[in-house]
Amino acid sequence: MRTGAAVPSVPDTATLAEAIVEMSGKGMGMTIVTRNGAVAGIFTDGDLRRCLGAGGDPMRRGIADVMTRTPRIIEVDRLAADCVLLMETPPKVTQLVVVDAAGALAGAIHVHDLFRARVV
C-alpha cells in the first residue's frame, strides 16, 4: 500500500490540469479526489480518456465535474487477497482507495503493488 506523499490526491476544487499533473507525478494511473479531507471520488486514466473524447475544452473543467464519485474502497485492515477479489469484481479495476476505520483516506493500492508483493 502506498501512503502519505506517495498517494496521488487533489482537492475537489482542483482543475483537470492539476489532477493530470498529480497523476503523472505519482505513477498510479489515478488521483484520489478529496473534500475537506474525506474521499469524494477518484479520477483515473480511463476517466481522462472519456473526458477528452467528450469534446470541448476539458482543461477548463473542474475535477469534481469529471471524477468518478464511487471509487472502489477497501479498509486498511483487510488482507491483500481481499484487494485482489475486490479488483476482480466486475467492473474490474486496477486501483483501490484505502480508508481507515473512520473512513478517512489511509492510502492507495495498485495491482502492480500486489504483483511486486507476489500476492498475484
Model-derived features: positions:
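Bateman (tandem CBS) regulatory domains
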Residues: 1-7, 60-71
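Hydrophobic pocket-lining "lid/loop/helix" segments that shape and contact the acyl-thioester
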Residues: 2-4, 17, 28, 38
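Short, flexible active-site loop motifs that bind/organize anionic cofactors or intermediates
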Residues: 6-9, 38-39, 73, 104
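The conserved cystathionine-beta-synthase
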Residues: 9-27, 52, 73-93, 98-100, ...
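Short Gly/charged-rich anion-binding patches and loops
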Residues: 18, 38, 61, 82, ...
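A glycine-centered beta-loop-beta connector
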Residues: 23-26, 31-47, 87, 96-112
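Helical hairpin unit composed of two closely spaced alpha helices linked by a short loop
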Residues: 27-55, 59-68, 76
